[in-house]
């Protein structure tokens, strides 16, 4: 849902205009090694070519059968930093929840398999401060690092647990430098990283092609006055926006509703012909973003019956109904002849749904409320070539590490290093989550008979029958990136 105004910005460094944006540099990796890549940077997650596998799946007659498909892998990583900084538990929970929805809304429907969670924060200042920890200066609305690390991991683990997805990979980094020449580095605004791996059938790996008169359906919970303006708030520097707007922008999680939606998606993709022809999840910007996205991607327009949008709070204004970011919703396009079948699936899974509109040939978004039209805008106004952000900067010499003093207390210093959160055991972040739910986990974080949390990777099986699967690992070195970004990547 992001327009990436920073990553797509035009950069001028030392009075020299850069040819590529940051996003261009990111995409270079896939351009140079795209052999097994089916889709990247154009859907809700990336799709990587897989293998032919046997799976257990219900037939059209609702009997479990052994079927064989070309199964591809999907991968997604994003961050949910601003909400986690403002309200750690719901911020991290909806970060994981939003990433799960992105996986499910890939192509014409996919299955999330295992999760990835990471945290970067400044010094924790647990009880008494350590010698290297200075006084923490934060805006009142920003949670402290220790508060974030007490609440946010529970939020992420809670959502993964309730949804029914194992979280078998992650990292935790504490970094905050001292001031040198009035500059310091740290994570007062944290990084909350949410990612995951899933599977998708080859036939479902790309979005479908639809025409006019396809039905637009919203599945999931009703509209509530939750998460208003989160897409804008997350793009501001911390402390820039109004404090009340900051808190209003944080979404609230409902993992059970998301599980119901995922079961509907799974049931649709089990059919001999997938009922879902197009799907997007509802995230930042709410329906005001998701529905125009669907219209733009299908090269069509959409007419919406405003009264058909499910609403829990009748006092909400049209703007609030259209723009709220109530979680656990998806927007789908289905054929009119599939509606009864779709209704029966939603009823069985107890998943709320509503047919809110249809596709039209005129490339515009119309919100119709009886004789009144709240919104009638051409897609070109929403998705046209927007002016790019221009950023000027200069390179600065970075002070190298100071050499260690010859007189060191090895035993004391070793203890300080080993108890530093970036070095010490991460077991407290691991055992809060179910690592085997779903039955496809092959390698989680725990190793050996004593279950020591030292695994370097996560591994899952493609199916209950297969001996092949997906492996993922993650690495980060911000303390080196401060001085040598290239070395930190190597």
Language-model segment annotations:
Residues 1-490:
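Glycine/proline-enriched, intrinsically flexible loops and inter-domain linkers
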């Amino acid at each position: 849902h992001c327009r990436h105004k920073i990553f797509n910005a035009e950069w001028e460094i030392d009075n020299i205009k850069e040819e590529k944006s940051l996003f261009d540099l990111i995409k270079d990796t896939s351009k140079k090694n795209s052999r097994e890549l089916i889709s990247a940077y154009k859907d809700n997650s990336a799709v990587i070519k897989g293998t032919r596998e046997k799976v257990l799946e219900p037939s059209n007659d609702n009997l479990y059968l052994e079927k064989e498909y070309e199964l591809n892998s999907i991968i997604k990583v994003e961050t949910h930093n601003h909400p986690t900084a403002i309200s750690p538990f719901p911020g991290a929970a909806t970060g994981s929840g939003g990433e799960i929805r992105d996986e499910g809304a890939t192509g014409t429907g996919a299955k999330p398999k295992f999760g990835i969670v990471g945290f970067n924060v400044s010094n924790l200042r647990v009880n008494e401060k350590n010698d290297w920890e200075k006084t923490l200066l934060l805006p009142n609305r920003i949670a402290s690092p220790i508060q974030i690390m007490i609440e946010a991991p529970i939020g992420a683990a809670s959502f993964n647990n309730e949804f029914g997805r194992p979280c078998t990979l992650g990292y935790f980094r504490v970094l905050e430098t001292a001031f040198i020449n009035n500059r310091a580095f740290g994570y007062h605004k944290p990084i909350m990283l949410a990612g995951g791996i899933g599977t998708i059938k080859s036939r479902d790996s790309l979005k479908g092609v639809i025409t006019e008169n396809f039905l637009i359906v919203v599945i999931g919970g009703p509209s509530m006055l939750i998460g208003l303006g989160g897409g804008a708030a997350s793009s501001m520097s911390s402390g820039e926006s109004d404090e009340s707007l900051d808190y209003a922008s944080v979404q609230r999680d409902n993992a059970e509703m998301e599980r119901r939606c995922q079961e509907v998606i799974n049931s649709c993709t089990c059919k001999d012909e997938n009922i879902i022809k197009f799907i997007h999840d509802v995230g930042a910007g709410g329906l005001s973003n998701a529905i125009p996205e669907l219209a733009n991607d299908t090269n069509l327009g959409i007419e919406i019956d405003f009264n058909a949008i499910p609403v829990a709070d009748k006092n909400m204004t049209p703007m609030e109904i259209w723009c709220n970011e109530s979680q656990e919703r998806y927007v789908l396009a289905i054929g009119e002849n599939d509606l009864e079948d779709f209704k029966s699936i939603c009823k069985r899974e107890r998943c709320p749904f509503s047919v809110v509109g249809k596709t039209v040939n005129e490339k515009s978004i119309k919100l119709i409320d009886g004789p009144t039209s709240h919104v009638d805008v051409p897609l070109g106004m929403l998705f046209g070539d927007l002016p790019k952000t221009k950023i000027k900067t200069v390179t600065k010499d970075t002070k190298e590490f100071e050499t260690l003093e010859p007189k060191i207390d090895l035993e004391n210093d070793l203890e300080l290093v080993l108890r530093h959160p970036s070095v010490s055991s991460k077991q407290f972040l691991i055992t809060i989550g179910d690592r085997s739910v779903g039955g496809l986990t092959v390698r989680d974080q725990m190793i050996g008979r004593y279950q020591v949390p030292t695994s370097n990777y996560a591994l899952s099986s493609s199916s209950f029958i297969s001996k092949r699967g997906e492996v993922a690992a993650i690495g980060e070195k911000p303390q080196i990136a401060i001085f040598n970004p290239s070395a930190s990547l190597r």
